Amino acid sequence: MNENNLQTKKLVNFGPSGRAVAQPIDKSLLDNIFEHLTMERYANVQYFSMYLWFQERDLNGFASHFLSESQGEMEHAQKFADYLIARGQSVKLDEIPAPVQTWDSIEELISYSFNMEASILKE
């Protein structure tokens, strides 16, 4: 019985976190997941910045919308992180740039938001 346990252990791969995984994640896929995780985190911070801009101007409907968008992006990032952990992978958090915080008008902010989302969808 001990011999069977030893043979089974040899068939199991372990990820960097020490958790057993069925199959290691391909490096290029892992790099893409980390890149997407970083994009989700940046979008979270950027949408939060937009929320603050509207909140400071008592534009509560817009503020509520962008707060919801910010929370949604954080949930997306969390799902990617949870997936990596479930696969036995340590999560690497890359640095994200500071968000834009000033706009001259509502139209400029909405346009910025649209262009940011469009660029994320391209990648």
Q: Language-model segments: what does each one mean?
A:
Residues 1-123:
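Iron-associated oxidoreductase/ferritin-like identity signal
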